Amino acid sequence: GFFATAAAVVMAKGVPVFCDVDESLHMDPAKIEALITPRTVALAPTHVMGSVCNMHAIMEVARRHNLKVVEDCAQSCGGKVNGSYVGTFGDVGIFSISAYKIVGGGEGGLLITDDERLWDRANCLSEGGGLWRPERFAPPRYEGELFCGTNYRMSELEAAVDVVQLSKMPETVARFRTVKRQITGRLKTYREIRPQTMNDPDGEVGYTLRFFPETIELGQEIAKALKDAGIGAGIRGRNGRPDWHIYHDMYPITLKTKSGADDCSFHCPHYAAKGGKIEYRLGDCPVADDLFDRVVNVGLNQWYTEEDCVQFADVMNSVLSHFCTEDPSAKPWR
């Protein structure tokens, strides 16, 4: 995921707890329950780099423990899980429309929900605590409706741009999926490489191709060779620079800093009174630590032609065959 998801928890006066991942590089449903305490109020599965979480398993855990679910769909807008769009499983789905996302329209984002009370609260937060209502200055229509909100909202001009951009989303996602399938369908399999596990191969957006060489050093060599051959590949872990896409480098979180003037999140007396105390350490999420250091990320372009895809796959096969051993029985690309 990215730091922003955890930061949103702190801004809401909460304390984020990180869950480890599996080979899909998404929240591992099997590891959620061990992290749940009487203080847990919500799960925040994050759909990353065009792929999707195992939402059915996550929702089962949430229902069993009566927890809210907030889906962070910023990096996978248009993705699906078993035919249903990401963002429609949880209580709230959150999307980003910043310039470098799948659907870009400036800055900011949007949310969706089928809970009318949550929808009212979102509107109160974005427009003065209640000014959006038909009778702007009326008393509360029900207990708890009004609170001191803000004016966190995009401009009318940006909203108009975003409406048009969102209308293009299905075609954009379809192009990415076609490109990735044309490439992965031509890639050979290798003993020393495990492609990322896909929770829904047909539902992912498909703008990245990710795989795990068996060692960090092999990953570094492959990434460099791919770049030298003209393919946009890279690694994020063990490159000598901190990265706010991995929990232990999210310094505003790990250092337990404030959000705003007060100190009511990590150091809240109410949190402490309920037995709350958290420390963030390297090794808290060992699978994430391992995979993040080894994963090679390859970016794809929605405008690749079929000829481009053939050439792309040929170059990848050439590079991978130089470093790895072909093995038809190895894990296939998806």
Q: Where is each model-derived feature located?
A:
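PLP-dependent aminotransferase-like
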Residues: 1-73, 80
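Proline-centric
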Residues: 20, 297-305
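Active-site region of PLP-dependent enzymes
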Residues: 76-82, 89-208, 215, 242-243
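Basic phosphate/pyrophosphate-binding loop/patch that engages nucleotide-derived ligands
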Residues: 36, 59-68, 105, 110-130, ...
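Short, conserved charged micro-motifs
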Residues: 216-222, 305-311
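Conserved PLP cofactor-binding pocket of PLP-dependent enzymes
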Residues: 130-140, 182-185, 223-295, 324-334
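Short beta-strand segments
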Residues: 44-46, 96, 196-197, 207-213, ...
